[in-house]
UniProtKB/Swiss-Prot annotation:
Function, in words: Casein kinases are operationally defined by their preferential utilization of acidic proteins such as caseins as substrates. It can phosphorylate a large number of proteins. Participates in Wnt signaling.
GO process annotations (BP): negative regulation of canonical Wnt signaling pathway; signal transduction; Wnt signaling pathway
Record key words, sorted: Acetylation, ATP-binding, Cytoplasm, Kinase, Nucleotide-binding, Serine/threonine-protein kinase, Transferase, Wnt signaling pathway
Organism, scientific name: Homo sapiens
Protein's UniProt name: Casein kinase I isoform alpha-like
């Protein structure tokens, strides 16, 4: 196996987590596949140079500590320093929803969108009950689990999360304006564009844009061109504000427009009615006569690919028997995410 992870491969962190290869990277640094030397368990290892201007891994590790035990929150194995790096060792998860969207040719059925929506709302609700906002809701930050957790959705990347109320007094942070936009501009709420301090309503509105991204395959404010990043953000903001919810959701069940209108109508400190939002989509799911069987679009594709691989493998064996020659076959055209 070729190794593209440079000098970090074979490094052991936390006394028992051996780095195998690089599997991703972000603004903070790199993510490696690691193996636990004591039991052979695979883990994900995030490395951040201690020289970075704005370190965020320590903060993120504190967030994971607070959130531990929640459904769909990855387990944190270890945090510490190793060879000039801050290191966070987590459960190894499966592909992100962005990966799976691409795998499914950027088309999700309504059944898949609704099954995902149910879990996504619950993940954000849990983070909010722990007094934090996520502030970077996007398909890349929702990952499916692996093995027996392959149908469970996990929420990751709490580097931009912010405490919105005090644990003891339950005092909410004050309303402010002139704030810089935090998060991913494509899914940012209108109030975030306007420079208003984010609160629970903004996470929920961002989620509504993710739903419509999956439904439509793209959002009307994608692909806008501008000379500078600032001008691009302004164009996106203008397009988002000038696109009525009914236009954004045209051609899709009314529940999606109801969801977005509800979120946009929330007051700064107001608690979203998470159960009402889940029920919107659960009732729609039943109305459309879907079965909640965790058969997602990618489940079907992978099953089909596995069947094709098995059948081509069988044909290969037949050909080998007939000709006495080994026939090299492509066993599977799907990456095991």
């Amino acid at each position: 196996m070729t190794n593209n992870s440079g000098s970090k491969a074979e490094l052991v962190v936390g006394g028992k987590y051996k780095l195998v290869r690089k599997i991703g990277s972000g603004s903070f640094g790199d993510v490696y596949l690691g193996i636990t030397t004591t039991n052979g368990e695979d883990v994900a290892v995030k490395l951040e140079s201690q020289k970075v201007k704005h370190p965020q891994l320590l903060y993120e590790s504190k967030l994971y500590t607070i959130l531990q035990g929640g459904v769909g929150i990855p387990h944190m194995h270890w945090y510490g320093q190793e060879k000039d790096n801050n290191v966070l060792v987590m459960d190894l998860l499966g592909p992100s929803l962005e990966d799976l969207f691409n795998f499914c040719s950027r088309r999700f059925t309504m059944k898949t969108v609704l099954m995902l929506a149910d879990q996504m709302i619950s993940r954000i609700e849990y983070v909010h009950t722990k007094n934090f906002l996520h502030r970077d809701i996007k398909p890349d930050n929702f990952l499916m689990g692996t093995g027996r957790h392959c149908n469970k959705l996990f929420l990751i990347d709490f580097g931009l999360a912010k405490k919105y109320r005090d644990n003891r007094t339950r005092q909410h942070i004050p309303y402010r304006e002139d704030k810089h936009l935090i998060g991913t501009v494509r899914y940012a709420s209108i109030n975030a564009h306007l420079g208003i301090e984010q609160s629970r309503r903004d996470d929920m509105e961002s989620l509504g844009y993710v739903f419509m991204y999956f439904n439509r395959t793209s959002l009307p404010w994608q692909g806008l061109r501008a000379m500078t990043k600032k001008q691009k953000y302004e164009k996106i903001s203008e397009k988002k504000m000038s696109t009525p919810v009914e236009v954004l959701c045209k051609g899709f069940p009314a529940e999606f427009a109801m969801y977005l209108n509800y979120c946009r109508g929330l007051r700064f400190e107001e608690v979203p009615d998470y159960m009402y939002l889940r029920q919107l989509f659960r009732i729609l799911f039943r109305t459309l006569n879907h079965q909640y069987d965790y058969t997602f679009d990618w489940t079907m594709l992978k099953q089909k690919a596995a069947q094709q691989a098995a059948s081509s493998s069988g044909q290969g064996q037949q050909a080998q028997t007939q000709t006495g020659k080994q026939t090299e076959k492509n066993k599977n055209n799907v990456k095991d995410n």
